[in-house]
């Protein structure tokens, strides 16, 4: 009986640790970022304006910001649209990359659009999946002036479909970490 209890505790701990790791903000290596910026791949003079709940507009200026597409993550600033491919090998996420002009239909090509609604000021992220498989994304949101981003729940994007994520608080950037192919119908739930 004691061994069963130990195995249960071990499995529970492994499950919690796995969930926590999936919710970690992807790290951008400083050396890699420096090289990318020297090659001109970074975004320069990024200005983002977000309307706050009190009606005022807060502007954020970033002199030099990471590229929109890195192998381990995507960055979508408020007002931006982005198209990226999630590469998989044996159903395991490998990397993000820019879409090619004529991408094979079997690839998970995703379109992102981050906007603020005029009526209530909420922020919405539209994600369109042009691939053949449902995909779940690990999303993180960054508030104006914040150095880091926080994990946020998200819904899977069905094959050939779209999903909208909404936030009532100000968000200037959404960072997309790992993508996961959804192979189980039960996993098509939002979390």
Give the location of each predicted region.
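Short acidic, flexible loop segments centered on an aromatic residue
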Residues: 133-148
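N-terminal signal peptide c-region/cleavage motif recognized by signal peptidases
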Residues: 17-19
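N-terminal targeting leaders for non-cytosolic proteins
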Residues: 26-89
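Intrinsically disordered, low-complexity Pro/Gly/Ser/Thr-rich segments with frequent PxxP/GP/PP motifs
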Residues: 64-88, 144-181
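Bacterial N-terminal signal peptides that target proteins for export
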Residues: 1-10
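Asparagine-centered strand-capping/turn motif at beta-strand->loop junctions
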Residues: 125-131
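Low-complexity, acidic Ser/Thr/Pro/Gly-rich terminal tails and inter-domain linkers that flank the onset
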Residues: 31, 36-37, 42-45, 85, ...
